[in-house]
């Protein structure tokens, strides 16, 4: 029942690394649209979707959507081939730099197309009553209060630990849990990051998620070659 309409993107901007993630192009859409200053071009593949636009005055044209072919940035994706690597990766001093840089605002999560962390809260309808509900609400893994329990304890206590969690979730955990063999056809071995670069644009402290991931790839390379990380 869901129809997918793709808005064409032909030009990369400075923070984007979609080509590295394999998300720069697709053939999985029901309609594609190009919007210019003077006209709208559309390729409609789905008959039912085409019928929905029958009231529009349009003329036939030869339109095939184009895609970004190259970015200004090229990401080195961290190669985590075994779970035994997770402990030494977690212990890297590399993550400590984010303790000073990150202000834990969660802005990067709010603009991310794939962030889906949530919290569970109890909502009481009226003070003193016993009626209410338990709700699952959207949250941010970069917030100081994320994972905080009723007793005040926290699983991750620093911005650096939160950054480590986010990076590993995007570039290891998701694929390890859901698409181990890549059979689902998700780009780049099912990495959760799509390389849109919106988080880099949003961060008020100018922290680059691209640099964080690229830097981790370099640290892992050092580990694998026996160099000092």
Language-model regions, residue ranges each:
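Secondary-structure boundary elements
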Residues: 10, 104-105, 222
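Glycine-centered flexibility sites
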Residues: 22, 106, 195-197
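Oxyanion-binding "anion nests"
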Residues: 80, 102-113
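Iron-sulfur-associated redox domains of electron-transfer enzymes in respiratory
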Residues: 1-87, 95, 115-118, 126
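Short gly/pro-enriched beta-turn/loop segments at secondary-structure junctions
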Residues: 35-37, 96-97, 103-107, 136
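Ferredoxin-type iron-sulfur electron-transfer modules in oxidoreductases and energy-metabolism complexes
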Residues: 79-100, 118-229
């Amino acid at each position: 029942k869901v129809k997918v309409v793709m808005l064409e993107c032909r030009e990369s901007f400075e923070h984007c690394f979609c080509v590295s993630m394999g998300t720069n192009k697709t053939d999985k859409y029901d309609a594609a649209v190009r919007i210019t200053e003077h006209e709208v071009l559309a390729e409609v593949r789905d008959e039912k979707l085409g019928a929905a636009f029958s009231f529009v005055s349009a003329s036939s044209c030869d339109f095939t959507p184009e895609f970004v072919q190259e970015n200004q940035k090229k990401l080195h994706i961290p190669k985590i081939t075994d779970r035994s690597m997770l402990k030494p990766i977690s212990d890297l001093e590399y993550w400590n730099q984010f303790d000073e840089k990150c202000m834990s605002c969660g802005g990067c999560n709010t603009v991310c197309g794939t962030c889906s962390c949530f919290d569970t809260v109890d909502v009481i309808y009226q003070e003193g009553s016993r009626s209410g509900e338990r709700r699952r609400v959207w949250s941010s893994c970069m917030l100081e209060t994320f994972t905080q329990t009723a007793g005040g304890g926290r699983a991750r206590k620093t911005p650096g630990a939160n950054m480590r969690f986010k990076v590993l979730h995007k570039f290891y955990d998701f694929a390890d849990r859901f698409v181990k063999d890549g059979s689902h056809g998700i780009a780049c071995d099912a990495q959760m990051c799509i390389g849109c670069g919106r988080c880099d644009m949003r961060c008020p402290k100018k922290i680059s998620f691209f640099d964080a991931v690229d830097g981790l790839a370099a640290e892992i390379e050092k580990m694998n070659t026996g160099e000092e990380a």
